Structure formats: structure tokens, C-alpha cells
Amino acid sequence: MTALQHVAVLMGGWSSEREVSLRSGAACAAALERKGYRVTRIDVQRDIATVLQNLKPDVALVMLHGKPGEDGTIQGVLETLGIPYSHSGVLSSSLAMRKDLAKTVMATAGVPVAEGLTLTRAEIAKAHVMAPPYVIKPVADGSSVGVFIVTEDQAHPPQELFRDDWPHGEELLVEKYIAGRELTCAVIKGEASDVIEIVPLLKFYDYEAKYSKGASKHVLPAPVLPFVYQEVRRLTLAAHGALGCRGVSRADFRYDDRIEGTGGLVCLEVNTQPGMTETSLVPELAGYAGVAFDELVQWMVEDASLDR
């Protein structure tokens, strides 16, 4: 890629993660402009195919979180229009977005995942479908949106499940709650990054903790035993490969350090479109490895292709 190329930064959209996407996109667009690229910022709406067809950018930097940018939809549009793009392709994006299906694929590849069930909202709302504590989460949302932790002292599932305006879809994933620490590792330039521990200053690492300054503490490198550290890195690459991810991805883990060896490690999910805001983990991990934010964004553009 040359500095004269025209990059369309795709952001916004209509998912529950719209605001985070706008922040990620704005940060990346500014970085590319500092590098000399011609940049067009696009707040993605339903007419995106027409907008791109008229604009004819050389490459698309996808900074969409949730649908339609993280589930394979926008990737299909870009493939059809012949516009090289960043991050993962159609199949891996749609697969990773469906947490239940992604877990099946990762487990087959030897990546440990949480015990869980995929059920309808009505089934889950009736009564406990497994012994508490357990976690209820949308099968295809990110940023911890719509996540509920059901504890032992709760006699019934969350009453929010009965809402007429429930926004998170009718299929939900119910998983056994995994006690322990939050660890995260990324794949950047084909290699596993260092490992970071997230210590929420709230009750758990929810949307507010992820995107509000001072709402969580990041410890880098994560203070775990060396063999655990390396196992997180190995599993991150294994999950990335099993799902067919490309470009940058991020794997999130729970680690119960009361269990001997690495038996307490569980992969919660792989994010094919990690956040790029001022509080996001991937820029922090890249920076720790000596890759500045602007260089990371430029690499994402240089890595763009139609072979995803």
C-alpha cells in the first residue's frame, strides 16, 4: 500500500456496539491521515453497497463491531464489490460471531471452552436451566452487551428476560460460570501477543468496564506462572487458526488459578473485530510489543486483501 491510496474506514452501523465502533473508526481514520493516506469515514447504513460502489476506495478498513460488520455481512458486500478489506473473511467472521458454533469448532481443535447450552429466551426465563452460578449471554453480541450473571442466591432467572422490548435476539447461550481471572491475548501480524490481565473495578468486565476510563485495571504482562502464560498464547493461536481468522483477532479467557496446571484455563470467545479505542486492549498489547498505534493501523491496511 502507498500513502496515496484511498481508504474507506467503515464504522458505526446499527448494532448495540455502534458507539464503540464510531470511536474505533475515528481513532483509526486519524491514524491513517497522519500516515498520509486519503481517508473517507463512512457511517455504515443499509445503503452501504451503493455508497461503496460510488466511492470506489482502494481498500476498506473494517471498524464495525457487532452486526453487520462482525458477522460476515459487510465482508460479503466487499467481496462482491471486489474491494480488499481488513480482518477476517465471510466464513470466519460469521462463525466467530455465533458464540455457540465457535465454541464447538474451538473445542474440536483442543481449545477448552465453558460448558453450555443454546436455548430460547422463553425456555431460560421459565426456571433455572442449570444450577447457579451461570451466565446468560446473546449468541451473537459483543462488548458484554446483554450479559447476565445468575448467582446462587437468585431464586429465578433474571426478570429482564420477560421484557417485551428485549433487544438481544431469541436465542441465548447459557454457560456454567467460570470463577477466576480475566486474561486476554491477541494475534497481531500472525503471532500471539503478550498476555494481559483485566481487573474490573466493577462487578465484572462489562460494557462500562471495557470502555470507560478508570473502570478496569490492566496488568501487562499478566502476573501468572510462565507455563500458564505460554499456554494462553498457544491457545490464542489455536483458536485463531481453528476459526480461520485473518489479520488481528483477540481471544478472551477465564483462568481459575486454584486448579493445578493449566486446567483452569477456559476460552470464552474470539473477537474478530477487536476494539481500537483509547481504552481497548489490542492497541495496548501492540504498544507493549513496540508497535505504535499508527503503525498498527497502517499494517491492518497493508494486510487487507480479498483472500480472507
Swiss-Prot record:
Cofactor-binding details, from the entry: Binds 2 magnesium or manganese ions per subunit.
Molecular function terms from GO: ATP binding; D-alanine-D-alanine ligase activity; metal ion binding
TM spans (from-to): none
Residues reported in the UniProt entry to bind ATP: 130-184
Chain ranges of the ATP-grasp domain: 103-302
Record-stated family: Belongs to the D-alanine--D-alanine ligase family.
Protein name: D-alanine--D-alanine ligase
Source organism of this protein record: Afipia carboxidovorans (strain ATCC 49405 / DSM 1227 / KCTC 32145 / OM5) (Oligotropha carboxidovorans)
Lineage: Bacteria, Pseudomonadati, Pseudomonadota, Alphaproteobacteria, Hyphomicrobiales
